Amino acid sequence: MSKRVEVLLTQLPAYNRLKTPYEAELIETAKKMTAPGKGLLAADESTGSCSKRFAGIGLSNTAEHRRQYRALMLECEGFEQYISGVILHDETVYQKAKTGETFPQYLRRRGVVPGIKTDCGLEPLVEGAKGEQMTAGLDGYIKRAKKYYAMGCRFCKWRNVYKIQNGTVSEAVVRFNAETLARYAILSQLCGLVPIVEPEVMIDGTHDIETCQRVSQHVWSEVVSALHRHGVVWEGCLLKPNMVVPGAESGLKGHAEQVAEYTVKTLARVIPPALPGVTFLSGGLSEVMASEYLNAMNNCPLPRPWKLTFSYARALQSSAIKRWGGKESGVEAGRRAFMHRAKMNSLAQLGKYNRADDDKDSQSLYVAGNTY
C-alpha cells in the first residue's frame, strides 16, 4: 500500500465499535435499568437548585438538609418496585444512608442501580447564537468516571440543551453539542458506566409542536451520527430526550395522543433499534401530564423497538417535597406522595395508567431556563 493511500485511510472515520472490557456489564446494566414497569429517579439537583426548592418550604440549604431530602426518597420502603436506577449528585455519592452505608452502596444492596451526573453545568457557546449554551466537564473526565465506578456507580448522565429561538437553533450548537455528547458517551463506556445521553430541546419558547418536532429530529439525528462516528456500544447506552411538545409560552397545549404520535414518530426516524431504552425527561410538565404523555406513548400504534420510560426529577418529587416540608413529622406524608407518583409512572410505562386514579390537580412545573 502506498504512503499516500495510508495517509488517506487515516483521515477516514473509523466507525468501529468501541472496544471496552466492560461491554457485557454495560449491556446487562442498561437492560436492568429499562426493566418493565420501572424508570429512573433524577435526584441530581445542584446545590443551587436545592436552594430554590427549599425556599418554597422555608428550609435552609445545608448539606445535612440536602442529605435528608435525598433520604426522603432513597430510603422509602418498597420504591425499588417502581425505580430501577437513581441519578445522584456528586455530593450525594459521599453521603450516608441511615444504615451507615454510602448511598451508592445502599442502593445496590436494594437492587437499584446508582448513577451519577458527570457534566459540570452549562456555559455560553461563543460560536452559537445569542443565549445558546454548551456543557462543561470533559477535562479530566476519565479520572472522574473511574472514581465513580469504584464508588459503586454503574451509569452516568450528561445534559446538553438547545433553546429554540425564531423557530430554530444554530447549526453551531447542534454540531458542537453532538460531538460533546458522543465523546462523553464513549469515555463513560471505557470506564464501565452506561451513558445516558441527554440532548434536551427545551420547552422554553413560543414555538408550536411542529417546530419542536423539526428541531428535535435534527438535533437527535446529529447526536446519533456523532455516536456512530465514535463507535458507541448502542446496547449499553440510553437516551434521555425531551418529549415533542409546544413551547411553554406559546399558549398551545398538546393533548396526550398528539404528543405521543409526534414524539414516537420522531424517535423512529432517527434512533437505532439497538438502543435498549428511551428515558424521557419531564422538562417542566406537571406531574400528571408527565404520566399521561408517557402512558400515551406506550399505547401509541407506531413501531416502538425501545423501552419508553421515565427519568423524572420534578415530576416525581414536587408533591413529595411539599408534603415533607423539611420536617421529621412530614416524612411519611412525603414518602406516600413520592410512592404515588412512582406508581403512576410505573403504570404509564406499562401503558396502564388511568387519569381517574391520579391526583385532581395538575400544576405546571415549568421554570424558564431551568438548570440542574
From Swiss-Prot:
Pfam families per record: Glycolytic
Coiled coil: none
Enzyme class, broadest EC rank: lyase
InterPro entries linked to this entry: Aldolase_I_AS (IPR029768), Aldolase_TIM (IPR013785), FBA_I (IPR000741)
Active site residues of this protein: E198 (proton acceptor), K240 (schiff-base intermediate with dihydroxyacetone-p)
Residues that hold substrate according to the record: R66, K157
Family: Belongs to the class I fructose-bisphosphate aldolase family.
Single GO cellular component term: glycosome
Protein name: Fructose-bisphosphate aldolase, glycosomal
PANTHER family given in the database record: FRUCTOSE-BISPHOSPHATE ALDOLASE (PTHR11627)
Entry annotated with the keyword Cell membrane: no
